């Protein structure tokens, strides 16, 4: 469920509880909540004896909102999972845009989520620098970006899209890749947070 700021939280959680009790869902999942609101929602659901196990939020090297709004810490403290959508930043964290915007990219064919103005020289340089870090790890940029999302165990899963089965198989290799060094994490932060 995605948060509706115009509906009282108690009403929303009550409706979600009814969905679970009626057998239409096994548990509650929340999407795009901040840390404080998630804690309040979790308390309401706990009082209702309704299982709540997962948060779904956008999270990637470039988008760290769940760190800034307290959700990541609140989920860890409350032993709730997080599933990250857009872990590759709509494809920005792949090798697809290392040399600019390809003619057949979603920027040109489907401009709903990714726009040409997001690819200024500063962003492209950041992507290229991140790619160099990935190469030094023996990984593709996509693999490193996925590893970064799940690096500390707080994010329990990622939603990945793929246009080819081979992409999924390549991305699964992150499950066996080496942990990041402190130096690598600092370099990643320098690349991403300089935007």
Task: Describe the predicted segments one by one.
Residues 4-195:
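Beta/alpha (TIM)-barrel catalytic core signal, keyed to glycine-rich beta->alpha loops juxtaposed to Asp/Glu
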Residues 1:
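Histidine-centered active-site/metal-ligand motif
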């Amino acid at each position: 469920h995605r948060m509706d700021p115009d509906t009282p939280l108690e009403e929303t959680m009550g409706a979600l509880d009814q969905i679970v009790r009626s057998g239409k869902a096994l548990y509650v999942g929340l999407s795009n909540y901040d840390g404080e609101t998630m804690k309040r929602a979790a308390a309401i659901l706990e009082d209702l004896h309704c299982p709540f196990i997962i948060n779904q939020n956008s999270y990637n090297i470039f988008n760290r909102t769940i760190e800034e709004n307290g959700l990541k810490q609140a989920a860890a403290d409350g032993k709730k999972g997080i599933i990250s959508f857009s872990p590759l930043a709509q494809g920005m964290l792949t090798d697809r845009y290392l040399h600019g915007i390809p003619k057949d990219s979603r920027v040109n064919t489907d401009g709903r989520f990714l726009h040409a103005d997001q690819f200024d020289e500063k962003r492209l340089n950041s992507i290229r620098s991140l790619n160099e870090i990935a190469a030094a790890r023996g990984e593709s940029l996509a693999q490193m970006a996925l590893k970064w999302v799940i690096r500390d165990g707080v994010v329990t899963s990622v939603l990945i899209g793929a246009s080819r089965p081979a992409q999924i198989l390549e991305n699964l290799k992150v499950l066996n890749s080496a942990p990041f060094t402190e130096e690598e994490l600092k370099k990643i932060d320098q690349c991403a947070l300089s935007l």
